[in-house]
From Swiss-Prot:
Belongs to the multi antimicrobial extrusion (MATE) (TC 2.A.66.1) family. MdtK subfamily. The chain crosses the membrane at residues 11-31, 53-73, 93-113, 127-147, 160-180, 189-209, 243-263, 276-296, 314-334, 350-370, 387-407, 418-438. Keywords: Antiport, Cell inner membrane, Cell membrane, Ion transport, Membrane, Sodium, Sodium transport, Transmembrane, Transmembrane helix, Transport. It comes from Escherichia coli O157:H7. Multidrug efflux pump that functions probably as a Na(+)/drug antiporter. Residues 1-10, 74-92, 148-159, 210-242, 297-313, 371-386, 439-457 are cytoplasmic. This is Multidrug resistance protein MdtK.
Length: 457
């Protein structure tokens, strides 16, 4: 029992800074929405539309680079720190290539926005302008993620937290300058949010690089000489590890986007109630997602040390802590669901529906916690391909079709509206959680030599 308590302390020490960093990132989005809304409703809507296209694109790149964390953690655990600098350099090359692709996609996203049914031309122009300003931040964001993943792979999660809050503090005044046109800058409205956010991502990257250059704990990595040229073999391995994670993230984001589109014809009350429950669940999701990042680090580090039993301990501890957290957030959600809904909207019908959906959200949180931590464990084992297959099957083969049938058809019961989609979420996430646990169990039952060989690739 003592080893699990010790491991839980280590996991929480890693996870808490990640949680705070994620809160800072979420707050940046909130600040953009509020400040754009303060300028005009059209500008706020433009930021929302632009963000809905930006997120799937940038999260794809983000997921691809997550492969660095277990790679660096495993090298650190095995004492092969001299190889870390080369992996990081290749991570920067990969981030640069992906940035160019993302920027090209976002530059041409105007075709998607203008093809939306009945969209106001002025709104479309502002949304396109916002995206074309924001896309210049894509390299800064992805370079920052490479540097952050280097730190986190070395079990240094506090720098990412600090840079997140630096970004938030810079974002507010820079937003103000570019939205309203102060200090000689043009008045850009919602487009100014894109300019500010792009600038902030570069500030965060440069601040992180400054930290890495000064950190004593990374002196040996910093001083390691090696080629700065692209290494096709290393980049291919990073892509092999990262692409399944990127696709899994992409399918998860697009699932919720598709459900939002399917709910939209049901009416304002249904859309608002669904959005409230989803937004609050997203806030609660920060906890298990951050714990999953910590579990990836610990499992990768233990495998690097050559201890499959300690890796199992880290995995099991992460799951136990995650279930405890999810149980607490579920109890909190059920107990205060009406009060939470009232924070978003005071329409009685909306509050009633949102409170009802939050009962389902409470169940959803437990399944979600298990599956996201399971995904973190598999990343630690470098078993990322299975994450993609599990996620795709659970969300798009089981979750979405069952949600659609329950919500909008009478094949099983009378159409349930948004509640049907939430039951679909539960079916999908519970299926993912079960499959993740079965895969983890299979991996952990392999001979130690095979586990360590797979982890060292």
């Amino acid at each position: 029992m003592q080893k699990y308590i010790s491991e839980a302390r280590l996991l929480l020490a890693l996870a808490i800074p990640v949680i705070l960093a994620q809160i800072a990132q979420t707050a940046m989005g909130f600040v953009d929405t509020v400040m754009a809304g303060g300028y005009s409703a059209t500008d706020m809507a433009a930021v929302a539309i632009g963000t809905s296209i930006w997120l799937p694109a940038i999260l794809f790149g983000h997921g691809l680079l997550l492969a660095l964390t277990p790679v660096i953690a495993q090298l650190n655990g095995s004492g092969r720190r001299e190889r870390i600098a080369h992996q990081v350099r290749q991570g920067f090359w990969l981030a640069g290539f992906v940035s160019v692709l993302i920027m090209l996609v976002l530059w041409n996203a105007g075709y998607i926005i203008r093809s939306m049914e009945n969209i106001d031309p002025a709104l479309a122009d502002k949304a396109v302008g916002y995206l074309r300003a924001l896309l210049w931040g894509a390299p800064g964001y992805l370079f920052f993620q490479v540097a952050r993943n280097q730190c986190e792979g070395l079990a240094k999660t506090k720098p990412g937290m600090v840079m997140g809050f630096i970004g938030l503090l810079v974002n507010i005044p820079v937003n103000y300058i570019f939205i309203y046109g102060h200090f000689g800058m043009p008045e850009l409205g919602g487009v100014g949010c894109g300019v500010a956010t792009a600038a902030v991502y570069w500030v965060m990257f440069l601040a992180m690089v400054s930290y890495i250059k000064r950190a004593r704990s990374m002196r040996d990595i910093r001083n390691e000489k090696g080629t700065a040229k692209p290494d096709p073999a290393v980049m291919k391995r990073l892509i092999q590890l990262g692409l399944p994670i990127a696709l899994a993230l992409f399918f998860e984001v697009t699932l919720f986007a598709v459900v939002a589109l399917l709910v939209s014809p049901l009416g304002i009350v249904d859309v608002a109630g669904h959005q409230i429950a989803l937004n609050f669940s997203s806030l609660m999701f920060v906890l298990p997602m951050s714990l999953a990042a910590a579990v990836t680090i610990r499992v990768g580090y233990r495998l690097g040390q050559g201890s499959t039993l300690d890796a199992q301990t880290a995995a099991r501890t992460g799951l136990m802590v995650g279930v405890c957290m999810a149980t607490l957030t579920a109890i909190f959600t059920v107990s205060l669901r009406e009060q939470i809904a009232l924070l978003y909207n005071d329409n009685p019908e909306v509050v009633t529906l949102a409170a009802h959906l939050m009962l389902l959200a409470a169940v959803y949180q437990i399944s979600d916690s298990i599956q996201v931590i399971g995904s973190g464990i598999l990343r630690g084992y470098k078993d990322t391909r299975s994450i993609f297959y599990i996620t795709f099957t659970a969300y798009w083969v089981l979750g979405l079709p069952s949600g659609y049938i329950l919500a909008l058809t009478d094949l099983v019961v009378e159409p349930m509206g948004p509640a049907g989609f939430w039951i679909g979420f539960i079916i999908g996430l519970t299926s993912a959680a079960i499959m993740m646990m079965l895969r983890m169990r299979y991996l952990q039952r392999l001979p130690s030599a095979i586990i360590l060989q797979r982890a060292s690739r």
